[in-house]
Design a protein with these regions (language model features):
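Structural/interface elements that position substrates and couple domains in central-metabolism enzymes
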Residues: 1-433
Length: 433
């Protein structure tokens, strides 16, 4: 099939590349000419395992193209994906200005029947809005469908190529058939294509992400209670998650959720609920717990060292909001580091992939180390903020020698309290008093 994907951000770039990988001819459209030139030369602006290699191979095999000519790209395509950003507005709602701008341009470019796909995460009712905008610009037939993405950063390529389900919101049999044909090669293992009405598909993305956010906040709430009553949060987690009705995913205590999806989608769903006369108390509480969780971690540090940290330097391991990505949007590290800086602390930080991203957030306010062990030199404590694999089994003897005092604040519950305390460390984690 001939496809255009409008927007070369995280979602658009992964979707376009993976669709090309299955033999489709894909044009990725963006108005940033410098970015497009870099992509043509195999320079990828985001870190996502396997993506760079796949872009290079599909570009060289003439299946994947990058263009700033939206009109020509739409004219050549049967399916047009809208994958532009929907940034959070001041009131928590999703800002649809880019979606609406693209819809208007698509309408002007349509020359025959097209399937227009909302791939961006958008509020319920957006497809109707897009349809009305396009109708004003063209007399040609078209259908607008919703096809939300469920990609995990750090595993996005695998998630797209081997999805556990594909959700298609469509009110048109013609569009549904085309979308089923498009996704057939991705679902040879028998995982389902779930066909539903457009509004239900739009709601599904928000419902799924908000549920996962609630699970994370629930795990953190339980861990905080465990600390107060003297229970072991890890043992409680294991006992609870052994129940098949509950399962183990997204129930690990830590520093809360971050990234480009969960925080934004939770707030957007709350806004949608409130705007339609519904209370979203459970979801609102998850958001509050998430914000508080980072500050509780800072409180652990100040409880030990005192409120004045002007003579303290901390090593930070991990800046990205999760492993296997360089994304720092809504990362716990931002809140925690800024809070420590305000109290006078100095920071020496290291992350395997997010160092350049961190410079955008912190500039020269912190020191950037070249390795995890360099970050430890002459610091008063180690703060583990992201659970990268290379931090899971470090050389603790080396850590002890490099730190001025052998203290670890583990925000991801990666290490064994028993073994570290036996080795002479002072150890703080989440959910253990």
């Amino acid at each position: 099939m001939n496809i255009c994907v409008i927007g070369t951000g995280y979602v658009g770039l992964v979707a376009g590349t993976c669709l090309a990988e299955m033999g489709n001819t894909v044009i990725c459209v963006d108005n940033n000419k410098e970015k497009l030139e870099k992509l043509r030369n195999g320079i990828v602006p985001i870190f996502e395992p396997g993506l760079e290699e796949m872009i290079k191979s599909n570009t060289s095999e003439n299946r994947l193209y990058f263009s700033d000519d939206l009109k020509a790209s739409v004219e050549k395509s049967t399916i047009c994906f809208i994958a532009v950003g929907t940034p959070q507005g001041e009131d928590g709602s999703a800002d649809l200005k880019y979606v609406c701008q693209v819809a208007e341009e698509i309408g002007k470019a349509i020359n025959e029947y097209k399937v227009i796909v909302d791939k961006s995460t958008v509020p319920v009712g957006t497809a109707e809005k897009v349809t009305e905008i396009i109708k004003k610009q063209t007399s040609h037939d078209f259908d607008v469908v919703s096809n939300p993405e469920f990609l995990k950063q750090g595993a996005a390529v695998d998630d797209f190529l081997k999805p556990d389900r594909v959700v298609i919101g469509s009110d048109s049999q013609r569009a549904t058939k085309i979308m089923q044909e498009l996704y057939a090669p991705f679902l040879r293992t028998g995982n389902p294509v779930i066909i539903m009405d457009v509004k239900s598909a739009e709601m599904t993305k928000y419902a799924a992400n908000s549920f996962l956010a609630v699970k994370i906040s629930y795990a953190n709430e339980i861990a905080n209670i465990c600390e107060k009553v003297g229970a072991n949060a890890e043992m409680v987690r294991i006992g609870m998650c052994s129940d098949k009705r509950i399962g183990s995913q997204f129930l690990f205590p830590g520093l809360g959720y971050g990234g480009s999806c969960f925080p934004k989608d939770v707030k957007a769903l709350i806004k949608t609920a409130n705007g339609n006369g519904c209370n979203a108390d459970l979801i609102s509480s998850a958001d509050k717990v998430n914000k508080r969780q980072r500050l509780l971690f800072v409180e652990k540090i100040t409880k030990y060292f005192g409120e004045d940290l002007s003579n303290k330097t901390f090593a930070v391991w991990g800046l990205a909001f999760k492993p296997k990505t360089d994304d720092m949007r809504e990362a716990p590290s931002i809140t925690i580091i800024n809070a420590l800086l305000e109290k006078g602390a100095k920071i020496q930080a290291y992350d395997p992939k997010a160092m350049q991203t961190a410079k955008y957030h912190f500039a020269d306010k912190i020191t950037y180390a070249n390795s995890s062990y360099e970050a430890l030199e002459n610091t008063d404590a180690l703060l583990l903020l992201t659970e990268w694999n290379e931090f899971r089994r470090p050389d603790f003897d080396k850590i002890k020698k490099l730190l001025k005092t052998p203290i670890i604040f583990d925000g991801r519950n990666q290490y064994s309290r028993k073994s570290l305390e036996e080795s002479g460390f002072t150890y703080f984690s989440i959910g253990n008093s």
